[in-house]
């Protein structure tokens, strides 16, 4: 969250609401009935954490309202009734959800004006394009969204229910095979950090696996909050490999490369060349080292042999949806 015209968000925090597991444990601490974002994160040991956004779509509106309240009053420190608001939504977000979002903004927060933009379209704007295909992968969902001259093509949007949270879960599982045990919601957050700091995508998975068996070159160590040090090797690239091989976690779905290709194939034959040449990655789950090269290699193998393939992974892609929103909302034509 932040202000139009800024080049980066003022506030970045997870969409988590935490409630105390046992009431009255912290006597005299002025205990709240709910904690949001980083505070929920830091007190996770005594809380039960809930994620009101599932697969990119809001499923718990009471908790979502708490998150928005926290955003306006605690993070941005603004009166919502004094500022027009730009919200973003997942592609193919149900119309009822958009209406509910609008209702809460006008009725609960009294915003003077609001607009809801599709996330992937904003990412494309942020990359300086108006035509291309965006592969956006966050915590709960991934989408491939072909966009032509600023408009998303809804018939060709594909959704893949595989994203950051699944990778974290998979890493928890394969670390267990190594003899490390991570099970609680609090421990999941530790594993997420391991994933973000140490994982990478192999250009050639099988070859990387062979290398890791004979050499310790891929091994890295990580210090847990309690001071214990764990060693992680092949898990580093086995974890995000799931993006290209969902069958590894028992999912019958196409990987992100094939989903992108399928999305392009659903578009008019005349615009495919423009899409192949402008494949834009966005979202936190595209932050792995090696992802652009691997994506390029895999799509080149699927596409017609003469086709020019270009995969763009902008350095700011973790926040490119927000940056695109900042650009859009600061245009005078848009404000009118």
UniProtKB/Swiss-Prot annotation:
**Leftover remarks:** There are at least 13 actin genes in potato.
The beginning of the lineage is:
Eukaryota, Viridiplantae, Streptophyta, Embryophyta, Tracheophyta
The reply on keyword RNA-binding is no
Q: Write out the annotated subcellular location.
A: Cytoplasm, Cytoskeleton
Per its record, how is this protein called by name? Answer: Actin-82
E.C. numbers: 3.6.4.-
What the entry lists under Gene3D superfamilies is as follows: 3.30.420.40, Actin, Chain A, domain 4
What the record says about family reads: Belongs to the actin family.
Alphabetical UniProt keywords: ATP-binding, Cytoplasm, Cytoskeleton, Hydrolase, Nucleotide-binding
